[in-house]
Amino acid sequence: MNYKTVDVILERALLGDDISPQEGIVLLTQTDSGAIASIRHTADKLRQQQAGDTVTYVINRNINFTNICEQHCSFCAFRRNDGDADAYWLDWAGILEKSHDAVQRGATEICMQGGLHPQAQIDGKSLPYYLKLLETIKQEYPQIHLHAFSPQEVQFIARMDGLEYAGVISALQNAGVNSLPGTAAEVLDDQVRRVLCPEKINTATWLEIISTAHKLGLHTTSTILSGHIETPEQQIGHLEKLRSLQQIATNQKYPARITEFIVLPFVGQEAPKSLRRRVGRDQPVLADALLLGAVARIYLGNWIANHQPSWVKLGLAGATEALNWGCNDIGGTLMEEHITTMAGAVGGTCMEVETLQNAIASIGRPYQQRDTLYQPVESAKQLANTVIGNG
């Protein structure tokens, strides 16, 4: 593909046009350094137009409440069987302790997900257990934003209890869920899913649950697990499905939307040998993740303005570089992270606010704390300065 074609695609994108799947594939398959530099420049310019120069971050905590899981995804090093020596399942006191710690450290969000544990029930039902998880936190900390339970977990509860997805989502919402993580998406292509995660929900179910959440007024995020067995065509197919989903929510005037898109590069160090052999490496290729992030900005930016790298997957230096490739947000502090770390990631499990701020400042961009829905949050330090200044 010659430069002229790439330039024409990029010029159209800068004029505000949505590029086609075929054009997305053209961009994603470029190997020439000049063409890739043009893609990066365009993504960076669109980021500036669509999201501004300020880089945002959120103070949040992950709570992975159990690693006991009935499924056996080929890339997952987190799951354990009930009875394994290193299996765990947090009790209510443990959930509260982690929540208290999060609030003490200034968190505005708790992100809560876990393995699919068949015994996670109250009176023989799954939904009451998940509701108690939420109520345990919300009764003590009503102000905290609970970003909780992936579409896979919604389907698990519905299947275990014989419920409709809408009924499960409404019940979770009423008990305190404020937004839904768009994880378990991996790649929205059933051919890939049959290899990576054959027991997981299929593409249509993931899309249905996310769309149902939007109809019911529950915002969601969106993700892609990249850099394993998927092709550029399948990556673009994934982006196209997300764009279509957001277009439907917008055109139908649903009360909620996708708030952000996150590239999650595959970390395979602890993955099963068969998948490791097929992928051929254990850590992400930064250049591939950056190019996908740039193309995602060009492809999705008109519809999903906020794009985030994963410092857990890429390391802080890689995530900071992604801010020059179309990303406008650097993610959260997390405070603890098990799923990616157990897979062999080297990015760490916790990031101090000052570390994130310094990373953003190192590329000459201003920073701003935000909440889960991308509204600015005034830090305690900013508030103190305001009070002193007004005094």
Curated annotation (Swiss-Prot):
[4Fe-4S] cluster binds at C69, C73, C76. Pathway: Cofactor biosynthesis; coenzyme F0 biosynthesis. It catalyses: 5-amino-6-(D-ribitylamino)uracil + L-tyrosine + S-adenosyl-L-methionine = 5-amino-5-(4-hydroxybenzyl)-6-(D-ribitylimino)-5,6-dihydrouracil + 2-iminoacetate + 5'-deoxyadenosine + L-methionine + H(+). Its cofactor is [4Fe-4S] cluster. InterPro entries: Aldolase_TIM, CofH/MnqC-like_C, CofH_family, F420, FO_synthase_su2, rSAM. Binds 1 [4Fe-4S] cluster. The cluster is coordinated with 3 cysteines and an exchangeable S-adenosyl-L-methionine. Residues 55-302 form the Radical SAM core domain. Keywords: 4Fe-4S, Iron, Iron-sulfur, Metal-binding, S-adenosyl-L-methionine, Transferase. It comes from the Bacteria. GO terms for molecular function: 4 iron, 4 sulfur cluster binding; 5-amino-6-(D-ribitylamino)uracil--L-tyrosine 4-hydroxyphenyl transferase activity; 7,8-didemethyl-8-hydroxy-5-deazariboflavin synthase activity; iron ion binding. Its EC number is 2.5.1.147. Consists of two subunits, CofG and CofH. Belongs to the radical SAM superfamily. CofH family. Catalyzes the radical-mediated synthesis of 5-amino-5-(4-hydroxybenzyl)-6-(D-ribitylimino)-5,6-dihydrouracil from 5-amino-6-(D-ribitylamino)uracil and L-tyrosine. This is 5-amino-6-(D-ribitylamino)uracil--L-tyrosine 4-hydroxyphenyl transferase. It comes from Trichormus variabilis (strain ATCC 29413 / PCC 7937).
